[in-house]
Amino acid sequence: DQAVPFFEAWKKHIETIGFKTLSLRRTGSTDHVVFNGLGLPAYQFIQDELEYGRTYHTVMDTYERLSLEDLKVDAVIAAWIALSAAMDEGRIPTKPGLPAAPATR
């Protein structure tokens, strides 16, 4: 993927808080897919799976099971990636197969 060099450069600054792995592996449909369909490059951030196999999107998927520490780290990583993308002199290439321009209604 042409975006890998961007993410590799950006993650160097935040590896110590937990951003260590970059993967091109597809994991199925997630929230970012809608943005891709509109022609916007969007990427999926995956954290350790923890109890996903038993609780994710079930009645067991409740607020009490949230890890506040993980949410804080995720927020820092997402903010850093957004800031890095905004400040980078380059432009992240659009993913292959995406529309060249966002869809209009």
Annotate each PLM feature:
Residues 1-55:
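Metal-dependent peptidase/peptidase-like ectodomains
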Residues 47, 52-105:
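His/Asp/Glu-rich mid-to-C-terminal helical/loop segments that flank catalytic regions of hydrolases
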